[in-house]
């Protein structure tokens, strides 16, 4: 399914297929803001093993590399996930996806720029330190996980980034400037979304800031794992254009309705 509005294009399909078609059509985007499915941590992820998951990410972001303009940024929300223990005699395992992902992206050709730490309220985390709280044995200590990562990459370009800035008109530069308060460090305190029907929703504040910091007004933003459409709504709030791709029909319908309402 394909839905188009004045400032958005929404695709219900496999992101590899859709991005391939867009690339063959000569389409390019100015920024990517996305959150890939968690490895075996949500109901929509399905890989036989972790190596298959990393291969999926490599294939997906290789296409993203091709569709992204030279010198532009790709912002990816990822989290360390816990693989539950299968029986009491086994230990659970934390899988450091964000750290492995950097190697995947550098292999593709991206340049690593920033690691932004998204900190959520402590009450939003699953309790991991109950045993330690009771026994207080040092090697049993497990902190509650209240952070995720936003990893920012750049597609290499010839010359300095000033070359891109000069491509925009003076009015575009002025209207896109960040006025007032902004995030001064790489630690962002943002409450998670709680009302969304999506199982792993973006809080709107997160993509809205990334869009404002890494693109100009009327730029084209891509989210190939659109989910409930929060990146698209962020584009509406910041006067950008949006391309969204979602493979799940139910989530696509949810995001379509939400984005159509936002762009009215």
Regions found by a protein language model. Give the residues of each.
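Cysteine-dependent PTP/DSP-like catalytic domain, specifically the C-terminal lobe
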Residues: 250-264
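Core catalytic lobe of class I
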Residues: 1-254
């Amino acid at each position: 399914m394909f839905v188009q509005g004045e400032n958005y294009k929404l695709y219900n399909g496999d992101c590899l297929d859709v991005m391939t078609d867009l690339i063959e059509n000569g389409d390019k985007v100015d920024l990517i803001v996305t959150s890939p499915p968690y490895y075996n941590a949500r109901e929509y992820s399905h890989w036989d093993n972790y190596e298959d998951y990393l291969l999926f990410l490599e294939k997906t972001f290789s296409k993203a590399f091709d569709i992204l303009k030279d010198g532009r940024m790709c912002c990816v929300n990822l989290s360390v996930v816990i693989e539950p223990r299968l029986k009491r005699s086994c230990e659970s395992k934390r899988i450091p996806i964000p750290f492995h992902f950097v190697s995947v992206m550098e292999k593709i050709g991206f340049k690593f720029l920033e690691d932004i730490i998204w900190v959520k309220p402590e009450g939003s985390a699953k309790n991991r330190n109950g045993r330690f709280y009771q026994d207080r044995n040092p090697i049993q200590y497990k902190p509650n996980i209240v952070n995720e990562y936003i990893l920012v990459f750049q597609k290499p370009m010839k010359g300095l980034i000033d070359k891109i800035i000069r491509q925009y008109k003076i009015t575009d530069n002025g209207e896109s400037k960040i006025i007032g308060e902004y995030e001064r460090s790489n630690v962002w305190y943002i409450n998670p979304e709680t009302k969304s029907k999506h199982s792993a929703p973006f809080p709107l504040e997160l993509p809205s800031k990334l869009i404002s910091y890494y693109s100009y007004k009327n730029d084209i933003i891509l989210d190939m794992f659109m989910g409930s459409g929060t990146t698209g709504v962020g584009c509406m709030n910041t006067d950008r254009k949006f391309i969204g791709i979602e493979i799940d029909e139910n989530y696509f319908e949810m995001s379509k309705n939400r984005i159509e309402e936002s762009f009215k």
